């Protein structure tokens, strides 16, 4: 039997506000436990929440970016459940009247095709605290620094059909919230977390299968692995005569498996009701019109512009527009050197390799856009060859200065004097007289391979400084003379 996978994702994006959603407590990551929790966060009697206007602004920006309906009136609700790190015994969230309604996001897949994923809603809510188990013997500690941190929960339609599509969608959301400046997207710190709802059904069946939810997956790689494992688990279970149970599961990356955590709750299990401490939020059209003017160029728009303005391939444009910082870096390099394709190649290949090796983000690059753009200029004006440029790039990464300073200090300037190159080539050909005779006696196919030998000897003799184009042209003339 052929099976079809149905996936819906719930992404929790921690909003980049300076204070919590209902109190003035700071939201900085990594503070000592319970040093960023106020009386409101601790749910002390008599305290009342005050809504953070910046969180509302950020949610509205997101709604505008996904072309969603933004309700004029939205209401906060209490989601009731007990957990040790939830001081109030309920979470303030939104249920029937979320701030952001139906929208969509277009994603680009590995084969270059585009798919539109529907977004059901996005609502504001507060985060819970954190239970600490490993530092205590026979008990657990509670850190309430995170309690009350503003979250935007983004709920997709069940439009995703594979683990790879799921990763592409999460990457698109990740890029979007960073472009908007509403979330730093740091998955290692929990700023962006994903719950994956997975079910399978016989291909062609309209009715959905029973879904399982995989909670709090916090990396692109783990999202793909967790979903693929869950798909396989459900198919094997059904084919063996069993039934999929609606439940919440956890992904264990060490064992590459999902395991049952608890039965999956429905909305009525949480006994939602409007929060009596918070008035409905009214969002006027004039407010949204002003916000729309603040929208930056979004990832899809930037990618399309990179293709049309700079003539980049769809793949290159996609990589370079993946983050706002990467796009800004590339455009600065391009502005300096005036060659978009050379700039794209150096940013994606050499710089990308350096950043990956050292585990750095583009904003932490040891080579500035000004330095890289200046170096590419020296390739274009034939001051250095592409091969020497790699040496210059490495020196810049080691903090040895600008391209011009390094070229001067190390004597790396390319030899472009035809007379000097001809003299050097004569010496190379004299030293390899036997190979010269073999070349002249060979057919065209063999000559192509042998020519590379002479080029290599010439570049070796010049220590890589001879202009490669001149070497090729002059060498060909001499060998065919």
Swiss-Prot record:
The name of this protein is Aspartyl/glutamyl-tRNA(Asn/Gln) amidotransferase subunit B
Q: Which family does it belong to?
A: Belongs to the GatB/GatE family. GatB subfamily.
Question: Which Gene3D superfamilies does this UniProt record tie to the protein?
Answer: 1.10.10.410, GatB domain, N-terminal subdomain (1.10.150.380)
| SMART domains for this protein | GatB_Yqey
Q: Which reaction does it catalyse?
A: L-glutamyl-tRNA(Gln) + L-glutamine + ATP + H2O = L-glutaminyl-tRNA(Gln) + L-glutamate + ADP + phosphate + H(+); L-aspartyl-tRNA(Asn) + L-glutamine + ATP + H2O = L-asparaginyl-tRNA(Asn) + L-glutamate + ADP + phosphate + 2 H(+)
Record bears the keyword tRNA-binding: no
The opening ranks of the lineage are:
Bacteria, Pseudomonadati, Pseudomonadota, Gammaproteobacteria, Pseudomonadales
What GO molecular function annotation could you give as one example from this UniProt entry?
A: glutaminyl-tRNA synthase (glutamine-hydrolyzing) activity
Give the domain of life. Answer: Bacteria
